[in-house]
Amino acid sequence: GLLGLGYGGYGYGAALAAPAAVSYAAPAIAAAPAVSYAAPA
């Protein structure tokens, strides 16, 4: 993230950003099938 860029360059920023992106995406990925199953009902 931006803090990572400030505290050690692109590598550190990417190391912080990747887990954050996964943690944010995981609930959406998990919810998508539930929404698609619920939609017809």
From Swiss-Prot:
GO molecular function: structural constituent of cuticle
Keywords attached to this entry: Cuticle, Repeat
Keyword Repeat: yes
UniProt repeat feature Sequence, residue ranges: 17-20, 25-28, 31-34, 38-41
Record's keyword annotation contains Transferase: no
UniProt function note: Component of the cuticle of migratory locust which contains more than 100 different structural proteins.
The record's note on its domains: The tetrapeptide (A-A-P-[AV]) repeats found throughout the protein are also present in many proteins constituting the protective envelope of other species.
Name assigned to this protein: Cuticle protein 32
Organism: Locusta migratoria
